[in-house]
């Protein structure tokens, strides 16, 4: 014979919950006395306090082994990569000459990007250095901080400087300037005491034909040794990366051209197929004209 359990009324359930929360007979709150709750809270306070202290101690010990100026491990950044400006999502530089809005965003980005290179700012913050040699600033047992940086003046970019330029870096006339910059790598040396230079070309034969002529600023795409080595963001507070500007003069209109630019230096490998940005950068250039 099945014995049916008597169903509690709503009032009984409420009373049981009220008694669980606070039992006036035993003076228990949610099943525990005040003393029991005090011991529980004290235990967790000590437990989590100990964990926090252990975490803080281990972090402090670890930070004593790390320099705040130079990363401890840099082997993954042995070869600097190249990037272009104006910065676009897919490295596509598309210009519709007759459509101002299509290239005005590029012009605004370049204005902002080149602002730190203004000659007046460079003269105020950085040094005039001797070209053709590394600008080394060793500590010699005493922290040499901050490091000084060499001037890279905007006027060195010639017709791509954008100074008093009614063509807006050439974008309004279909002769755009694209800027090549080398990513910063701490304590990087070009090797063989020879200046580096950037070269650009079409990736395929048809790209080379459609690319046409171009000029580089500084001349021959040179990057002088005096801008190296780089000592890090905290050491080299006012460091400005050297740039190479490429002005494309007569790209075949309405055709997508694949361009690849490489940095040429004694110890930079540009043929690593696993890293498409090691010492090189590829981008697409299209000049639309109606």
Swiss-Prot record:
InterPro entries: Na/K_ATPase_sub_beta, Na/K_ATPase_sub_beta_sf. The chain crosses the membrane at residues 40-67. The keyword Ligase does not apply. Residues 1-39 are cytoplasmic. It comes from the Eukaryota. Signal peptide: none annotated. Residues 68-290 are extracellular. Disulfide bonds join 129-150, 160-177, 200-261. It is a single-pass type II membrane protein. The keyword Membrane applies. One of its GO terms (biological process) is neuronal-glial interaction involved in hindbrain glial-mediated radial cell migration. GO terms for molecular function: ATPase activator activity; ATPase binding; protein-macromolecule adaptor activity; transporter activator activity. This is the non-catalytic component of the active enzyme, which catalyzes the hydrolysis of ATP coupled with the exchange of Na(+) and K(+) ions across the plasma membrane. The exact function of the beta-2 subunit is not known. Mediates cell adhesion of neurons and astrocytes, and promotes neurite outgrowth. The sodium/potassium-transporting ATPase is composed of a catalytic alpha subunit, an auxiliary non-catalytic beta subunit and an additional regulatory subunit. Interacts with BSG. The C-terminal lobe folds into an immunoglobulin-like domain and mediates cell adhesion properties. This is Sodium/potassium-transporting ATPase subunit beta-2. The lineage of its organism: Eukaryota, Metazoa, Chordata, Craniata, Vertebrata.
